[in-house]
Amino acid sequence: MKALMKDFSLSAVVAGFIATVISYAGPLVIIFQAAKVANLPHDVLSSWVWTISIGSGVLGILLSVRYRVPIIIAWSAPGSALLVTMLPDITLNEAVGAYIVSSVVVLLVGLSGAFDRIINRLPAAIAAGMLAGILFRFGTGLFVSVKEQPWLVLAMFGTYLLFKRALPRYAVLAVLVVGVTITIASGELRSDALVIGLATPVWIAPEFSWQVILNIAFPLVMVALTGQFVPGMAVLRNDGYETPASPLISSSALGSLLLAPFGCHGLNLAAITAAICTGRESHENPSKRYVAGVSGGVFYLVLGIFGATLVSIFSAFPAALIAALAGLALLAAIGGALSAAMAVPSDREAALITFLVTASGMSFLGLSAAFWGLIFGIAAHLLLGLRKPIPAVASPPAVGRKEQPAR
C-alpha cells in the first residue's frame, strides 16, 4: 500500500477512469442488446453486469499490484456480440453451462503454457474473419437504426467522425454524451424506468448440451484467445512490458469460472482501453503506470456495486441510441478484423469464406454460424494450401539430329 501511495499520480487515476468509462460506454451496450433479445429478467441482467464488473475490478487490481503493470481486465465484447444471436434460441442455464466449459478450456490453455502454440497453429486470418463476421451485424445495425430516429443517429455518427479526426481516443465517449443529450432534450428518455439500487448476484444452475457447447463455448474460447488475449498482450509488449501471458490468462479464466454461475460469460485482457493506461498519457515513468490499472479496477468495483442502477439507466434510453452506440463503438474492431483477415494473400480466400459464413447467420445441424465459419474457413485453408502437383513436361525433340537407320 505504501508503494502504491508513493507511485500515485492524478494522470494515472484519470487514465483508469477513462478506460472504465469507455468500457461501459461501448461493450456494455452489447450486453444490454443480448439481454433484450433474450428477454432476460431485470435481476438476471443486473447480476450479469455485477459479475463482469466485480470480476474485472478485482482481477485488475490484484494483477496490476502483483506485476507492477497496468493490467485492465474486461469482458469480451465480441463474445457478447455472439450471445446476441445465440441467447434467444437456448435456455439461460445452457448458456451458463457453455460459459463454464469455455472458462475451463481457457484455464487449461493458460496453465499448460500452450497459448503461443495454439495461436501459431490457428491462421490469424481465419480468426480475424470469424471475429469480423460476428461483429458485422452491429455495423449494419448502426445504419438500420437511422430509419427509426434519423436525427439522433446521424448526430451521433457525425460526432464520431469529428472526434475520430481530432480526438480519436474520446470518440465513443463523445458519441455517448451527444446521444444522451439529444435524447433528454427531445423528451425520449423514459424517466419512469430509472431506479436507484444495488446489484445482487443471482445463481443460475448450469445445464450442459453438446450443441450449445459447440455453438457458444468453442467460439467463446476462440474469440477470447485470438480476439482479446492476443491484442491485449500485444498492447503490453508494445509499451515495453514483458509480463508472462500464462498467469494473466489463467487468472482471468479462473475468475470467469467462479463467476459463470452468476451470468459472467468471460473475462479477459482488455486491448483498446488498456492502451490508454499503458501509454505516456498515464505517466511518463512506465514503472508507475500500474496505478492506472488499480484505478480502473476501483472504478469497475464502484460501478459494479450499482449494477441495478446501470441497468435501469440503459433501459431508459431508446433502442436506436443503443444500436447506434454499439455500432460506432465496434467500427474500429470491425475494420481491424477485416484488415487482418485480408492481410495475407495466401489466406485471403479462406478468411473471406470464414467471414461470409459467420456473417450470414446460418444454422446447420443445430450449430451456429460462428462454429461453421471456423470449420469452413479451416477446411478452405487446408485445401487451398495443398501444393498442386507439377505436371510432367515431355522432353522436347532434339533439333537438327538425324535419325539413325535401323540395323
Residue map of PLM features:
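Structural signal for hydrophobic packing residues in well-ordered secondary-structure cores
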Residues: 21, 25, 38, 62, ...
